[in-house]
Every structure is written in C-alpha cells, then in structure tokens.
C-alpha cells in the first residue's frame, strides 16, 4: 500500500503544520505519509486584502477539490481558515491540541499598542483584529498586511508599518522572536478567531483511515473549537469577517466570549456566557440570540462594504 498523501499550502508555517501531522501519523497511527504542496486562491492573490477577494475557503477550496477527486488523502489546515459548512462528503477527522490562542503585537520601536503615536500604521490581515484595535485606539491607521510570516516581519523591519499583529501560535511554531518588542494580547483584550491555535485535518468521511485519524484528536480543544464554529455558523460567517469568538473550559464549566463589529471599531457588540459544560451548545444558541437581537446581522452586512 502506498503512503497517504497530505495536502498542504506551501508556506513555512503550513509545512510545519503538515510535517507535525506527518510525524504524529507515523508515531501514533503507524502510518507513513508524504506531503503534496497545493497553491490556494489566497496564496495566489497577494496584492488584495482578503475580504476584497470574495468567497469562502480562500485557503482551503483547492485542497478540498483534491480530496474529493481522491488525489490527496487528507488536508492539514489552520482551523481558523476552515469554513463552517463542508463540501458534501468531507469533514474534520480530528482537531489537534490547541497552541497559544492569543494575538501578538510586534514593533521595532514601540513596546505596546497604547504607546503607538497618533496615526501610526498597524498591519494586519484580519478585519477582526482591525476592529478590536480601532475599538481601543480610533486614532490608529490599520492597513492590510499580506504574505507569509517572514514577509510580514520584513515589512515591519523595513519601516512600512509601525506595528503588526500576528498569531502567537505561528510565531511559537516557527520559533520566531519576531521583533524588538513583542507582546501578546490577553483573550479579554483581543478575542481570537474561531479555532485559532488548532489544526484541523480534513478528509473524505468514507476514507478508510478517517476513524484512525481520530487518534490525533484532542477532546478538550475539539469541544471548544466546535462551540466556536457553531457560533460562527449561526451568524453565517466565515474567517474574513470581523467576528472573534473563544470558548474555554474551567473544570465542568465553559465560558464563551464573542465580539463583532465594523472594521473601523464602531457598532461593536461584545458579550459572554458561562455555564455548565453539559449545556454548552445551548449557551452558544443563547449567545447567538443575544447577538442577533442586538443587530449582529445588520452590522455584518455593513461590514461587507469595508
């Protein structure tokens, strides 16, 4: 029998993630595999902000097409990039243990967000981050920052930006210090994207190794990530819209924090729910209802114009 084929994007971070799964497959499932690099739409279009490209699955669609054709056996994604509704026949075989979920401030000159001068330019790919930055500092200029982690850091070092915001998990995985000043926001200060810090392994549901891959699943991380994805699904959202949501477990209790608003930091809704773990999905529905009653759908429609 031939090796399983892992589909992955070609960035250093994506390949770290694919190799991580490759090593775990060998060690924990006794399965040999090889990696096939796939360029996605989001990788090909680098001169346009992600929200302007349009469509869902900017970093997953091409991988999903290869899964459906049987040309690859599994696709390794950053879970935050995975649409909440799957193509027919596909699903997540596992969600890995979460790394650090936080967003991180990086700058050559300034120690933190509040020390930036008025009009400072902050680079980010994310409308969610832009919204939460503007909520704190309306006087800052948030601009689109595309490219892989190293490209973004070079733009910071060359002075194109006064600061940039990256995911802490990616910096840790690549063992990158990043810049002279590096400070992670607490989850309370900046609510992460759904699934941030976790990897999702996508496969055909009828693949003979679909069940086998569940050995790589982390139950606690998967539970929290599925709550977050349920919240996004209820708002018909994707990864390119200004929504942050984070679920965390504290013993038998769960806390779900969420925020959405316009990318300019206006018309922001922020709420949280806490309760018994056994009622977690009911809590998500209650939180959704509160957001919808507060005008969430209307705000997200306005956000499409940015």
Swiss-Prot record:
EC number: 2.5.1.61
Protein name: Porphobilinogen deaminase
Associated pathway: Porphyrin-containing compound metabolism; protoporphyrin-IX biosynthesis; coproporphyrinogen-III from 5-aminolevulinate: step 2/4
Cofactor: dipyrromethane
Swiss-Prot/TrEMBL GO biological process terms: protoporphyrinogen IX biosynthetic process
GO MF annotations in UniProt: hydroxymethylbilane synthase activity
Cofactor note: Binds 1 dipyrromethane group covalently.
Species assigned in the record: Helicobacter pylori (strain HPAG1)
Gene3D superfamilies: Periplasmic binding protein-like II, Porphobilinogen deaminase, C-terminal domain
Domain of life assignment: Bacteria
């Amino acid at each position: 029998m031939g090796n399983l084929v892992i589909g992955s994007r070609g960035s250093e971070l994506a390949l770290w993630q694919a190799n991580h799964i490759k090593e775990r497959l060998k060690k924990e499932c006794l399965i040999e595999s090889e990696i096939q690099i796939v360029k996605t739409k989001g990788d090909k279009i680098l001169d346009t902000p992600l929200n302007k490209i349009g469509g869902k699955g900017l970093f997953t669609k091409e991988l999903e097409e290869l899964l459906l054709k049987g040309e690859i056996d599994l696709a390794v994604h950053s879970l935050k990039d995975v649409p909440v509704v799957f193509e027919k026949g596909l699903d997540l075989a596992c969600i890995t243990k979460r790394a650090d979920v936080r967003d991180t401030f990086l700058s050559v000159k300034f120690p933190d967000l509040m020390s930036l001068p008025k009009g400072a330019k902050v680079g980010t790919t994310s409308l969610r981050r832009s919204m939460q930055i503007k909520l704190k500092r309306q006087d800052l200029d948030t601009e689109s920052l595309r490219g892989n982690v190293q490209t973004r850091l070079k733009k910071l070092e060359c002075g194109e930006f006064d600061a940039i915001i990256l995911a802490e998990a990616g910096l840790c995985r690549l063992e990158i210090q990043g810049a002279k000043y590096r400070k992670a926001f607490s989850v309370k200060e900046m609510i992460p994207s759904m699934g941030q810090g976790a990897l999702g392994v996508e496969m055909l549901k009828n693949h003979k190794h679909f069940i086998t891959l569940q050995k790589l699943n982390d139950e606690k991380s998967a539970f929290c990530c599925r709550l977050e994805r349920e919240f996004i699904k209820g708002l018909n959202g994707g990864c390119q819209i200004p929504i942050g949501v984070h679920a965390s477990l504290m013993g038998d209790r769960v806390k779900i924090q969420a925020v959405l608003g316009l990318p300019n930091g206006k018309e922001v809704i922020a709420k949280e729910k806490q309760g018994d773990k056994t009622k977690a999905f009911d809590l998500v529905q209650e939180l959704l209802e509160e957001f919808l009653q507060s005008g969430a759908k209307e705000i997200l429609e306005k956000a499409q114009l940015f």
